[in-house]
A protein has these predicted regions:
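Amphipathic alpha-helical interface elements
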Residues: 1-171
Length: 171
């Protein structure tokens, strides 16, 4: 199971990095500038995401990260996307421009009831994927994972509801 989750994670990261640069003038607007992200995201959220990415990059011991830090003036998006932890990657995606999130939703056929890209489902699914991946990596029981209630006690983050309607009655 972990093998396939890692494949999905790598695919989503790669596609997001590609689309992120494409939507930012083919990488001319670097990932560490706030205008590379959605105008709907708060400045605080964008700055937190960029700061987390910088922190994780600076702690990386990977040779290619060290090479870029020593020999170049900036770290390319693909390296940042590859190196940051899954939670930070999800934050990068969540704060990305609408064209990025909608392209990923379309790629995985994640639509809402009005046939619009369902970014909430995408982000929620990635958080669940992260939790399942972490459980597998630590040899924990996957069936014991449960959703914790959101801080505001709302039903936000409920990602299974749309799938129930799609399941056959015999399931």
């Amino acid at each position: 199971m972990l093998k396939y989750i890692n494949q999905v994670e790598e695919e989503v990261r790669t596609l997001t990095g590609y689309k992120f640069d494409q939507c930012n003038d083919n990488g001319k607007i670097p990932w560490y500038e706030t205008n590379a992200y959605s105008s709907n995201a708060t400045l605080q959220s964008k700055m937190n995401t960029i700061s987390s990415a910088y922190s994780e990059l600076s702690k990386s011991k990977s040779e290619y990260v060290q090479f870029y830090m020593k020999n170049h003036e900036q770290i390319p998006t693909w390296i940042m996307i590859k190196v940051v932890n899954f939670s930070t990657f999800i934050d990068v995606l969540h704060n990305s421009k609408t064209n990025v999130t909608h392209a990923i939703c379309k790629l995985y056929s994640m639509y809402d009831d009005h046939n619009l890209p369902n970014v909430k489902l995408l982000i929620g699914s990635l958080h669940w994927l992260r939790r399942v991946r972490n459980s597998c990596a630590h040899n924990e029981r996957v069936y014991c994972i449960h959703q914790t209630q959101a801080r505001n006690n709302s039903a936000s983050g409920r990602i299974l509801d749309p799938y129930y309607a799609q399941l056959p009655t015999s399931y």
